[in-house]
């Protein structure tokens, strides 16, 4: 037997293992479902940053855990003057979605008052002063999630609730 034969056999085994892993990743990409279910003002306190909460439901139909390595979502509200980006969600940790499970997770996004656009700031100022204000009932979210070996775009309209969960 030639000295190269074990290496060729080892290379073949490594190739089979790689292709098997690749097949699992492709399968996982086809079996991951997500839905941004809603956006709500979470914290509304003058002495602290405004906080928006974004709920995302993940469903993993694959037989392996899926690890989401990056998630990036811009949140837009449609005011009378047009659509305005109010926040960007970018969690710093990976998210593990266990095999064959559904998981709804809340993500909080802090926004400094000075970083709000003029229209949103005016609406919040009116609200602080006790005036009636009109708020959008839906938000537009745009971004992507990246997992092991694949990227899924996010682009949808979701319900928005301007009633803060935590307030002064």
State where each predicted segment sits.
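Asparagine-centered strand-capping/turn motif at beta-strand->loop junctions
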Residues: 56-65
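Terminal connector regions
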Residues: 113-168
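Hydrophobic beta-strand positions in extracellular immunoglobulin-like domains
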Residues: 58, 77, 109-111, 145
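Hydrophobic core residues within well-ordered beta-strands of beta-rich domains
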Residues: 50-52, 71, 103, 139
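Intrinsically disordered, low-complexity Pro/Gly/Ser/Thr-rich segments with frequent PxxP/GP/PP motifs
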Residues: 81-122
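Single-pass alpha-helical membrane anchors
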Residues: 1-22
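Short, hydrophobic/aromatic beta-strand segments
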Residues: 64-72
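Low-complexity, acidic Ser/Thr/Pro/Gly-rich terminal tails and inter-domain linkers that flank the onset
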Residues: 20-49
């Amino acid at each position: 037997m030639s000295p190269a034969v074990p290496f060729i056999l080892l290379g073949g085994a490594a190739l089979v293992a790689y292709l098997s892993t690749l097949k699992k990743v492709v399968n996982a990409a086809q079996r991951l479902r997500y839905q941004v279910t809603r956006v709500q003002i979470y914290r509304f306190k003058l002495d602290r940053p405004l906080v928006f909460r974004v709920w995302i439901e993940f469903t993993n139909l694959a037989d392996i855990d899926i690890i989401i390595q990056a998630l990036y979502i811009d949140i837009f509200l449609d005011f009378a003057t047009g659509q305005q980006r109010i926040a960007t969600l970018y969690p710093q940790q990976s998210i593990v979605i266990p095999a064959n499970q559904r998981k709804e997770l809340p993500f909080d996004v802090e926004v400094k008052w000075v970083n709000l656009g003029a229209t949103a700031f005016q609406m919040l100022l009116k609200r602080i002063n006790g005036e009636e204000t009109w708020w959008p009932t839906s938000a537009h979210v745009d971004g992507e999630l990246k997992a092991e070996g694949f990227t899924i775009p996010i682009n949808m309209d979701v319900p928005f609730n301007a009633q803060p969960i935590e307030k002064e």
